[in-house]
Amino acid sequence: MKRRIALVAALIGSIIGAMAGPVAAGELRIGGTGAVTDVLRALAPDFTARTGIALVVIPSLGSSGANNAVADGKLGLAVSGRDLRDKEKARGLQVVGLLRTPYGLVTSRPGPDSLARADVVGLYKSARPLWPDGMPMLIVLRPADDSDNDVLAALFPGMAEALTQLRKRRDLSVAATDQDNADMAERMNGSLVGATLAQIKAEKRNLRFVALDGVMPSLDAYLDGSYAHGKLLYLVAPATPGAEAKAFVDFLAGPAARSRLRDLGLVAGAR
């Protein structure tokens, strides 16, 4: 699995290297965390129809790769799964907007399934976790530096320690990307992985969310506070954003995109 992660890192490097030249006028190159790749593709036609700007979605970059590409002038905008690090701010990067989406646990089981939130960390710590009906629960991990680990730790007190212990085991799968994570979850009977509502909806995944304490992580539940846990997605621009990047940020924050974003399990909010 370490070899798989190294190959993904090399692929990201080759993609960034292939993006020759500065961002062209009349188009916006954008990329970022894998969970939003299909979200951006779904938004592109309406954005282009309204602005005349072509939205060119560069896949498979990840948050760090996309942020670096913005700093290098190869992307006009990034959508990052985490806030900026100090070294990225030192390169002139800035957060110019936010998207929010519910985050929860998904499974390949036909469902509906429900877990007590207080029991989840114990399942992650168990050597042989089981679903309530006795079916083996197959947990998939993310790389240690992935932003989803922080979201899980915030969702379940004690999860950070549980994930640290799980990484010592050699029998668990590690998903290098958001797409790998969903692919593995679909293939495994009894899977349990963390994911955003936006990714599951945009990619039309054959996965179902698990209710926590009886509450499903829907967008309505997230917005009314009955389901409190989500993931922030950061719109990252250079110190002087181009007109195309500004147009896309304005598009996301305005009424034209509101309905489509909701269909995809997202809401926009200015920082």
Question: Language-model segments: what does each one mean?
Answer:
Residues 26-64, 68-75, 80-99, 103-271:
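Exported/periplasmic ABC-transporter solute-binding proteins
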Residues 6-18:
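Bacterial N-terminal signal peptides
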